Every structure is written in structure tokens, then in C-alpha cells.
Amino acid sequence: MTFALIVGAVVLTALTAYLGWNREIYGRQPVYRSWWMWLGPLIAAVPVALRVLHINWGGPALSVVLLVLASGLMVGYVEELLFRGIAVKMLRAGGRREFSVAVLSSLLFALSHSVNVLQGQELRTVGTTVLYTFAFGALMYLTMRSFRFIIAAMILHGLTDPTAILATGGIDNVSDAAPAGIPAVVAGFTLFFLVPLGIILLLCVRGKAGEDKTGAHVADASVAS
């Protein structure tokens, strides 16, 4: 867990509290949900479950496992707070409909990972990561909207990176050697299912905060069916 990550978490948490945004960010989503939105967290959870089965739990020391998990959960908290919390709140406050909110917040999330090129990563790796994170961002938006609370997206996001690290030894890496076994299944699922389905589901997003499915303004759109 890096010092910068901890500082980022503290700063963002303090900022939202100072601005009085905690209720809007951490509270119940002010927009209705549809049954198909549950596909978002379901799709995102498949790679996590597969990696858990592949992890050699008897390999790394318990302290290493706990540190990786803690770091991953912190990443999930910070990134979701920034992109599904602050960004979504600001986009909704600007009067944008949920399709624009989902697309723009996912795009910002994806572009934030393009800075990896400054660390010397190959363009192919960065490009693949940006495409993946755009689709993943869409799935996290749907996770937040289907569960109705951002904490669900924070937890699912927080488990994604550490399970990848513990199962493969790293993230955002492209190896010349073809993966085998469960890692190959995860890679194939991500390439052929997670990314395209994430984008397809994103295109189906409708609604606007404060409105029910008919477009009528309601006091609490989150309780509308």
C-alpha cells in the first residue's frame, strides 16, 4: 500500500465531506434500476471467482496476501469514490442523463490509466488496459446502480486487482507466453465477453437522476421499479 494511495484516500474523503456530498455519493442512488443491470456485477465477478480458484493460497505469506488485499480494496475505494462518486455526482448535477453519466465517467476512468505510458509501458499494453478499464468502468457503474449503493462497486473493484496479482503475479501486463489453465479462461472471458458485453450494456443505460422509468419526477427515484 503506497503512501500516495493513502494520501489520495484521505484527501478525497475529506473533500467530499467538506463539500457536503457524502449523502449523495454514499447514499441510495437517486435513479431507478432495471433487472438487466444485474448483469454488470455478475460479469465483473466472474474473473474474480476464477482467479480465487487459481490462487496458490499456500504460497505467499499471510502478511503478503493481507497487504495485497488491503491495497486492492484501497484502490477500489479511491477509484470508485473519484469516478463513480465525485465524477458521477458532478455529471448528474450538470443535468446530464444517465447514459452520458455512465459513458463520461467510464471514459474518464479509462483515460486515467493511459498515464501508464509515461512509466514506460508499451502502447499495446496501455491501449488494451484503456479499453478494458472503459468496459470495466461501465460494469462498475451498473454495479453501483443495481445494488443502489457505491460501496458495492468499491468492494467488487477492490477484489479485482488483488486477485489478479495473487493469481498471476501482476496486473496490466502482456506476456509473450500464452496463458494456460484458468488464467487462459480469464483472459479469454475478458477479451471476448467482459469488454464487449460491458460496452453493449453501457449502450442500454437510460434514465435520469430524480426520474422514474416514465420520465416523471419523483421524490426518490431509487424506489421506483
Region locations from a protein language model:
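Membrane-interface helix/loop boundary segments of multi-pass membrane proteins
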Residues: 78-104, 145-149
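C-terminal membrane module of polytopic membrane proteins
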Residues: 26, 158-225
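Functionally important transmembrane alpha-helices
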Residues: 126-182
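Membrane-helix interface linkers and caps
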Residues: 1-41, 145, 197-218
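Hydrophobic alpha-helical transmembrane segments in multi-pass integral membrane proteins
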Residues: 47-52, 108-118, 164-179
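Small-polar-interrupted transmembrane alpha-helices in polytopic inner-membrane proteins
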Residues: 44, 76, 98-114
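Membrane-interface helix caps and helix-loop-helix hairpins in membrane proteins
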Residues: 51-62, 118-124
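Membrane-helix interface segments
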Residues: 34-35, 61-62, 95-100, 125-126, ...
